[in-house]
Every structure is written in structure tokens, then in C-alpha cells.
């Protein structure tokens, strides 16, 4: 006779009914500053009813009272089918949730904006601040005890940290990780340093159309961020240096099992953050020393020039630190910090090489004498404590302490650097960028002779003018010329808007890597001194000065002058000055009418042009900074820049002096960037 199957009793809830019912006990006030579901209740005028409504709707998703009683870890989900840098986020989400649940928390993911460089017009930088607002308000509004910020692509991690600092709830970062390199004709290639170098070969006629098409299939063979020391990888390294991401989190490839284990560990850390009685919030973790560590790492890895703008935006979100770190700080630290990492675009390796060589723990081990090891981290321990634990591991014994390690060529010791100092040079002196934000990635210069250079300026008024004239055989340019592109700053001078086409601001695009004129490229010229008020990709190389401030859209900028006639004889100048002033003021009035019209724009475009500040302040919206809307940082750059200028010289507010030539640009690295007439007179 068969026995009847054993009846399984339903599991008893871990939360006793009395505790459940307490949520509806009208005689007991609800702690609105509590944890879990009881925080940040919507306003229905009755807190008990608000909690009642919240619970009934979340239970529609199948959550039990046991689940809802746990600390809630929010997970920011930036997956998008338009964003291949974030293509592995579904797998990372599962791993983070596993870590949260194994540690006794409740993981709930929610979406925010997702930005990719190639799929946002006019540029992803234009939307970085919008993403930071989205991140801040979703963290602030929702009942989360800690938040995991999953991101990776260039503007994502800065936007998330900016928003996270402003919301000031416990946060921890998880990056998607770098992609793997590909292979083309037996040579390793990867996005996107090799994109640009090979495109330059194609423009010069050294590569045919079949090869460039075949190469396109190999440059980005997997999901993940660019596999060189571009902006995404730079910001990942800086998150570790700032203490906002665990020490092993920066370099594991996007498609590796190591990346999934890092994600699971991040979930565990997030629950620890959520359970702490004294919440470890970003404003408590981040100190001036944290930012000094980040800048040291920025210089040591030969990081992206874009990191300068992002760091300024991040620090100026912090109420206690805003204004204490400036571009001049980056320059000062660079003078005593060597470049240790041999990765493209400053060197030859890829992020997979960096990871195999020990990643950030190995690099920080070499940098110990230059770091503030007492800086706090998101784990609750100091950077020194984290580093002591990491360097004791087998991995570090293999890669750092072994004198025979072949990977030592990737991470150099302080005594044998790739570049002695100032991988990133910030021009704090000179009249071309009195805002003090102009930056040059000296370590990525292809012709070091250009670091001390004097040449005639060839000026382009925006991307359309550049595209129209750069390859014109009649262009008056030679290998010693200085290519200048203006009108691509934070606001920019949008050609469509000026033509009445309704275009918006430029958004500071990555157009600063001005292509070598084709007729010079065909002669073997691979680098020229180039200057712009825009940005360039962190994966790019060349002798390129970026972020000139004030930008060309500002009539007071040296780059902002629109028509040029420089008279070399003083008596001629005196005789014609009044006539020219009247003529140019009439022309400028017409231009300023267009400018005023842009300031009346509706929607996000209007918000952007009215509120965005300049590069030295982070290209953030003034009302989002810690100082708030009453402290517009647009005009503080010259005060911060300091430096030597001729006695009695004041930065000009010129409306009537400009020309494509004969302006002369003088670059004296790492000190001075000036614009003069052919006789050497400063404008």
C-alpha cells in the first residue's frame, strides 16, 4: 500500500503579524526618516495611508512581508540597446542582486538615462548634466537605503557621481568594464585610439577603402567600454582613487567572469552600507585628499583630458569642497607625478594588459609615496588599509614583487616612468585662455617638438567651416601652422541657429582633434599644434590644446572675435579705430540678437544655454553646484588662473579685432599659451 505524500506546510513568515500590523497602527507615528519602505513616503496627507498604498502596490510584484522588511538596495540600471558599452548590464544586474540577497538585503533596480558617445546628438556631454539630475532625483525620491550605480560609458560615471554627491545617500559604483581588443591583419586593435590612427591613414591615402571597411568589424569585438586609457577607463580608475569603488573594480574586462564576481561583491558591499547606523555617505567619504589622490592617478595613468572637466564638476557638487580644487591643482600635481602606465594613447598597451599586470592595486602600490593613504573609501576602510590587503594577495606577489615579471613594462616604477611628469598640462598663464582651463595631453603628443612652438594661426569658425575648408588644396597652411577651431565650447556658436534653422547649443563636442589637412597628411605630416574651445576623445592623441576658456561664443573671449583686421602701424590704427569700432559694433549687435534669441530657447536647450558654466568649473549647470544658482562661476576663471602676464596688461574684451591670420600662437609648455600679432604684441 502506497503511503500518501507528505504534506509540506507553508513556510512561516519571518516577520510576525504584530510587526506587520504595526504599520497600520494609527496611534504609533511612522518614522519617516527610517529605513526600507518607510522612508520617503509620497504625500497623501496621511503617513499611514501612504505606507499602506506603497505596500499594496509593491506586493503586486509578488514581494512578501519578509522581503519588504529588509534593507533596500537600489540598483541604477543604465542598460540601453543604443549603448554597447553597457551591453553586459543584464548579467551584472543578476550578479549584483545575488550579492544583495546573499547578504540579507532586497535588491530593486530602476532605470535612468543611458548615454553613449556615438548615439547622442549633438554630443553626450550635452546630456551629462541631465543624466546627473535624473540620477540625483531618483535616488532622492525613492525608498532606498543604499544605491549601486552601474555605468561605464564616458559621461555616465561622472553624471552618476555628480548626482550621487548631491543626493548624498550611500552609493557605490560598479563599472561595466573595458571591452576586449580585436585583431586586424595579425595586429591587435581596439577602440578607439586605433579608430583614429587608422582613419588618419585612410585620409592620407595610406589605407584603402576595403581595409578600412574590414577594420570596422574588428575595432569593437565585444561589449564594454573602450579598451584603452580613454575617458571611460580613466574615470573607472579615478573612482577607485576617490574611494567610491572597491580597489579591484576598475579593470576587469566586461565579458569576464571576474567582472561578474566584482558585481556580486558590490552587492554585498551595498548591503553593508545600508545596514550601517552611521551612514557612509559620499559627502563624508570624499575629502580634499580624495581628490588629490584622484589627480595623482589621473597623471600617472595618462588619463583623458575630459577628466579635468568631470573632476571640476564633481568637486563643485560637494558643499565642503567646492572651489578648493581647480585646474591649477591638476597642473601642480602633474609636475611631481610621472606617467607610469604604458597604455594607448600615451603608450602601446590595452586595458586587458593593465588588468593582467595587477590593475589598480598594482598601480597604487607603486604610487604609495605620492598618495594620501588615510583617505576613506566606500568599504569603510582607508585607502592604505585597502592597499595593504590587496598587495598581500597572490596576484600582487606575482605582478608587483617579482623582478622578472614581463608585465612590468605595462606598470612602470617611479624610478623608470614612461614620461617624467605632467602627462596632462594645464595652461594657467597666457592670454588665450584666461579662464585657466586649457589642457594639453603632452604624453600623447606625436611630435614633442610641438610642445615649444610658434606658428601662424589658421582659424575655422565651427565644424561646418572646418569640413568645408580643411581639405581645400588652396588652404593657406603648412606643417608649422596652428589649426584653431572655435565655436565648439559648452554653448558654442551653432551654425544652424545663426541661420535660423532652430539648432541648439553645440554641447562642447569631441571635435577638438582637428584633422590634419589632407594635402599635408599626404606629405607625411601626422601631428600639428591644434587649439579649440571644445573637447577631444580621451582615446585620441596628438598635440592638441583643448577647453580654451572663455569659449568662443563669449564676445569677450579672444576666440570670440568674429572679424579680423590687425593693422601693424600705430598711426593707421589710431586713424581707423573709431570707424572700425562703429562698423564692428553694428555687426556684433546683429550677432548678439541671435545670442539673445538662444537665451530665450524653451525646454532643455534653453536651460542648458542659460545655466551651463565654463570648463574650469566643470561645464555643469550653476543651479546644480553646491553654491547654487546665486554663484555663477562663469567669470571666476581669470581670478583662479593667476600666473604671469605683462605689467599693466588686462585681458581684452575686444569686439573688433580678429582674423584668420596673421594671428600667431605661442605655446611654451608647460607654462604659457598666448596669441599675438606677427610683431609679438599680445592681443
Which stretches of residues belong to each language-model region?
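Intrinsically disordered, low-complexity proline-rich tandem-repeat tracts
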Residues: 659-662, 670
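Short, well-structured alpha-helical segments in soluble
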Residues: 130-142
Amino acid at each position: 500500500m502506497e503511503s500518501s505524500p507528505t504534506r509540506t506546510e507553508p513556510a512561516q513568515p519571518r516577520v510576525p503579524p504584530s510587526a506587520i500590523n504595526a504599520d497600520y497602527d494609527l496611534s504609533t507615528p511612522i518614522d519617516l526618516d527610517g529605513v526600507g519602505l518607510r522612508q520617503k513616503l509620497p504625500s497623501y496627507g496621511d503617513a499611514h495611508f501612504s505606507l499602506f498604498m506603497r505596500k499594496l502596490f509593491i506586493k503586486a510584484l509578488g514581494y512578501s512581508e519578509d522581503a519588504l522588511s529588509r534593507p533596500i538596495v537600489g540598483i541604477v540600471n543604465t542598460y540601453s540597446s543604443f549603448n554597447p558599452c553597457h551591453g553586459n548590464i543584464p548579467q551584472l544586474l543578476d550578479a549584483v542582486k545575488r550579492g544583495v540577497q546573499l547578504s540579507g538585503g532586497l535588491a530593486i533596480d530602476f532605470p535612468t538615462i543611458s548615454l553613449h558617445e556615438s548615439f547622442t546628438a549633438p554630443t553626450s556631454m550635452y546630456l551629462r548634466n541631465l543624466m546627473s539630475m535624473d540620477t540625483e532625483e531618483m535616488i532622492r525620491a525613492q525608498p532606498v537605503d543604499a544605491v549601486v550605480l552601474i555605468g561605464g560609458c564616458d559621461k555616465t560615471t561622472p553624471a552618476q557621481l555628480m548626482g550621487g554627491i548631491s543626493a548624498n545617500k550611500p552609493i557605490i559604483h560598479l563599472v561595466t568594464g573595458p571591452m576586449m581588443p580585436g585583431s586586424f591583419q595579425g595586429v591587435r586593435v581596439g577602440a578607439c585610439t586605433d579608430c583614429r590612427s587608422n582613419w588618419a591613414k585612410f585620409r592620407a591615402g595610406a589605407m584603402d577603402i576595403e581595409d578600412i571597411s574590414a577594420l570596422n568589424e574588428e575595432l569593437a569585438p565585444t561589449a564594454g567600454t573602450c579598451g584603452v586609457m580613454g575617458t571611460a577607463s580613466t574615470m573607472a580608475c579615478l573612482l577607485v582613487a576617490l574611494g567610491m569603488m572597491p580597489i579591484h573594480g576598475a579593470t576587469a574586462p566586461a565579458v569576464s567572469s571576474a567582472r561578474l564576481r566584482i558585481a556580486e561583491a558590490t552587492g554585498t558591499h551595498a548591503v553593508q552600507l545600508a545596514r550601517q547606523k552611521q551612514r557612509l555617505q559620499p559627502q563624508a567619504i570624499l575629502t580634499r585628499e580624495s581628490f588629490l589622490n584622484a589627480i595623482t592617478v589621473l597623471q600617472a595613468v595618462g588619463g583623458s583630458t575630459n577628466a579635468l572637466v568631470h573632476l571640476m564638476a564633481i568637486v563643485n557638487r560637494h558643499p565642503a569642497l567646492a572651489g578648493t580644487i581647480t585646474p591649477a591643482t591638476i597642473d601642480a600635481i602633474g609636475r611631481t607625478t610621472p606617467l607610469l602606465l604604458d597604455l594607448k594613447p600615451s603608450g602601446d598597451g590595452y586595458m586587458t594588459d593593465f588588468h593582467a599586470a595587477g590593475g589598480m592595486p598594482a598601480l597604487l602600490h607603486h604610487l604609495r609615496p605620492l598618495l594620501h593613504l588615510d583617505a576613506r573609501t566606500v568599504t569603510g576602510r582607508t585607502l592604505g588599509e585597502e592597499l595593504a590587503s590587496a598587495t598581500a594577495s597572490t596576484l600582487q606577489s606575482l605582478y608587483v614583487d617579482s623582478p622578472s615579471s614581463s608585465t612590468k613594462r605595462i606598470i612602470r616604477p617611479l624610478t623608470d616612468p614612461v614620461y617624467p611628469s605632467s602627462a596632462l598640462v594645464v595652461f594657467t598663464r597666457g592670454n588665450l585662455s584666461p579662464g585657466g582651463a586649457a589642457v594639453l595631453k603632452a604624453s600623447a603628443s606625436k611630435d614633442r617638438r610641438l610642445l615649444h612652438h610658434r606658428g601662424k594661426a589658421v582659424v575655422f569658425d565651427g565644424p561646418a567651416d572646418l569640413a568645408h575648408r580643411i581639405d581645400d588644396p588652396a588652404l593657406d597652411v603648412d606643417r608649422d601652422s596652428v589649426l584653431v577651431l572655435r565655436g565648439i565650447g559648452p554653448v558654442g556658436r551653432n551654425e544652424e541657429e545663426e541661420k535660423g534653422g532652430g539648432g541648439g547649443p553645440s554641447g562642447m563636442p569631441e571635435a577638438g582633434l582637428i584633422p590634419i589637412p589632407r594635402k599635408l597628411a599626404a606629405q607625411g605630416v601626422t601631428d600639428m599644434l591644434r587649439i579649440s574651445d571644445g573637447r577631444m576623445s580621451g582615446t585620441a592623441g596628438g598635440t592638441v590644446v583643448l577647453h580654451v576658456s572663455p569659449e568662443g561664443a563669449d564676445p569677450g573671449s579672444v576666440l570670440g572675435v568674429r572679424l579680423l583686421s590687425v593693422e601693424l602701424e600705430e598711426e593707421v590704427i589710431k586713424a581707423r579705430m573709431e570707424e572700425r569700432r562703429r562698423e564692428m559694433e553694428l555687426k556684433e549687435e546683429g550677432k548678439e540678437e541671435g545670442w539673445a534669441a538662444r537665451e530665450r530657447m524653451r525646454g532643455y536647450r534653453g536651460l542648458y544655454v542659460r545655466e551651463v558654466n565654463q570648463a574650469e568649473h566643470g561645464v555643469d549647470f550653476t543651479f546644480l553646484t553646491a553654491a547654487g544658482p546665486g554663484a555663477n562661476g562663469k567669470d571666476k576663471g581669470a581670478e583662479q588662473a593667476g600666473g604671469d602676464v605683462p605689467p599693466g596688461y588686462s585681458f581684452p574684451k575686444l569686439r573688433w579685432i580678429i582674423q584668420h591670420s596673421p594671428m600667431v600662437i605661442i605655446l611654451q609648455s608647460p607654462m604659457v599659451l598666448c596669441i599675438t600679432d606677427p610683431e609679438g604684441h599680445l592681443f
